[in-house]
Amino acid sequence: MNRTVVEIIGFLSLVGSLAFVGVEIRQNTSAVRGATNQAISDQVGELMLTIATDDNLARLVKRLYDGETQDQFDPVDDMRLYMTIMTGLRRVENIFLQIEDGILDDRAFDRIGLSFYRSNYGQEIWQANKQFFDREFVPFFEKLLKNE
């Protein structure tokens, strides 16, 4: 009888421990998702603030939205805008990878500002560099670009 009681107590302790671990994992997952969403918002805000506070970069982005193509920018301005677009594309790729890993859900793409990448200039940069991105990201992003 004593042994049975000890085994029952041991079993209940094990079940209780597993339940506790499950709750902790769920809370940790929520915390990671929250921190990741905050990081994405911070990155978007930082990029927007950088453009807003740098007169030259703001002018370049305005030209991008006006439909200019890569050949209409001098080499230095082209490099500035190229680096800005590539930084944004890597951010979008990172969001995709985090969705693939189950850290984020598709709502994360609601905040990426696709018009930036749908511009003539953005499309040129994407077409010239897409081979350097995750092979599963490329068709996903191209489909995302086509959806209005």
Where are these regions (language model features)?
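Membrane-embedded hydrophobic alpha-helical segments
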Residues: 1-31, 35
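Amphipathic alpha-helical "stem/stalk" segments
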Residues: 27-148
